[in-house]
Swiss-Prot record:
Transmembrane segments: none annotated. The gene is aroC. Its cofactor is FMNH2. It comes from Bacillus cytotoxicus (strain DSM 22905 / CIP 110041 / 391-98 / NVH 391-98). Gene3D superfamilies: Chorismate synthase AroC. Keywords: Amino-acid biosynthesis, Aromatic amino acid biosynthesis, FAD, Flavoprotein, FMN, Lyase, NADP. Reduced FMN (FMNH(2)). This is Chorismate synthase. InterPro entries: Chorismate_synth (IPR000453), Chorismate_synth_AroC_sf (IPR035904), Chorismate_synthase_CS (IPR020541).
Length: 390
């Protein structure tokens, strides 16, 4: 499975094409729209979310509510494009229209792709960079992830995400009875946090940052239950599933670090407190006493829950902008201000769920058969029985 996205933040639409989705997967627009709505929620979001009410159009690859094995094309329109038709339109501008158009962006924002991208592609107007590098693109990544989640759900695999930390405020209560309980609690939290008291403090931290013209980041965690043992590979570096998961999470806008399981904490513990003892019982087969490895060893799943964390830096667009340099005059100025969020960590947890779900679904489809959902399901059932008796 693979996908590609296209579209700019204030262009007419965002598009993604998904290839390799097996035939026979039940899929309707509401499945995807539910995930898009989750992405748009979250304390600290900016005014753009009041304009956009994201709804997907499935334009190929699905017939009568079932995937047919062909590429799936998904489109999400940008309602805000109505205000940007001249600035972001594809048609050439007249000389008069160029004069009337807003000035070019020549002051790169520290922390963004603006300057590096402008140098790479030779853009004197950095809007060409910031429009594509915007996190608005994650809209269709979440759409792709929604399809991957459907694949996983059909195979009995559950995905959930939550926020562990925002702006230095860390959740103390992170335990849960079932993944359904985790989902229920976090869906009711404006910051997608399991710890209610910490959630209130996180919201206050966001308010304080917004009032001062600043932004704050945080840490999100994705948990996946039900993965079979042995998905991934130890044979080649580029087939290791933990490497693919790390790359996927790091590809999310503003993410600067990834942990799997206890992650960096492993550096502070002796091996006896890091590695997970192996157990066996007749009902479950092989299992582990603990899950410090986060469900992955040697590039493969262990059968325990997959646990991935990502660190998101504060959004670089600030209402009290940092110093930068105008590329035309080379003079020092305050960086450009674009409409932005004060904190997008809660929304980023939904994006993290999407990219993790995509990588896991891809690994399952590759390993257990790529064409039909019923065949994949049967192959996994046989594999699980084999693993129990091994």
């Amino acid at each position: 499975m693979r996908y590609i996205t296209a579209g700019e933040s204030h262009g007419p639409q965002l598009t993604t094409i998904l290839e390799g989705i097996p035939a026979g997967l039940p899929l309707v627009a509401d499945d995807i729209n539910a995930e898009l709505a989750r992405r748009q929620k979250g304390y600290g979001r900016g005014r753009r979310m009041q304009i956009e009410k994201d709804q997907v159009q499935i334009v190929s690859g699905v017939r009568h509510g079932q995937t047919i094995g062909a590429p799936i094309a998904l489109i999400v329109e940008n309602k805000d494009f109505a205000h940007w038709t001249k600035i972001m339109g594809a048609a050439p501008l007249t000389e008069q229209e160029k004069k009337e158009m807003k000035r070019q962006i020549t002051r790169p924002r520290p922390g963004h792709a603006d300057l590096n991208g402008a140098i790479k592609y030779g853009h004197r107007d950095m809007r060409n960079v910031l429009e594509r590098s915007s996190a608005r693109e994650t809209t269709v990544r979440v759409a792709a992830g929604a399809v991957a989640k459907k694949v996983l759900a059909e195979l009995g695999i559950k995905v959930a995400g939550h926020v562990i930390e925002i702006g230095g405020v860390r959740a103390e209560q992170t335990t849960y009875e079932t993944i359904e309980q985790l989902q229920e609690i976090t869906e009711a939290s404006p910051v997608r946090c399991l710890d209610g008291e910490a959630g209130k403090k996180m919201m206050q931290a966001i308010d304080d940052a917004k009032a001062s013209g600043d932004s704050i980041g945080g840490i999100v965690e994705v948990i996946v239950e039900g993965m079979p043992i042995g998905v991934g590979s130890y044979v080649h570096y580029d087939r290791k599933l933990d490497a693919k998961l790390a790359a996927a999470v790091m590809s999310i806008n503003a993410f600067k670090g990834v942990e799997i399981g206890i992650g960096f904490e492993a550096a502070h513990r002796p091996g006896s407190q890091v590695h997970d003892e192996i157990l066996w019982n007749e009902e479950e087969g092989y299992t582990r006493r603990t899950n410090h490895a986060g469900g992955l060893e040697g590039g493969m799943t262990t059968g325990m829950p997959v646990v991935v964390r990502g660190v998101m830096k504060p959004i670089p667009t600030l209402y009290k902008p940092l110093q930068s340099v105008d590329i035309e005059t080379k003079e020092s100025f305050s960086a450009s201000i674009e409409r932005s969020d004060s904190c997008a960590v809660p929304a980023a947890s939904v994006v993290a769920e999407a990219v993790v779900a995509w990588e896991l679904a891809t690994a399952l489809v590759e390993q257990f058969g790529a064409d039909r959902m019923d065949c994949i399901r049967e192959n996994i059932e046989r594999h699980n029985e084999y693993a129990r008796e091994f």
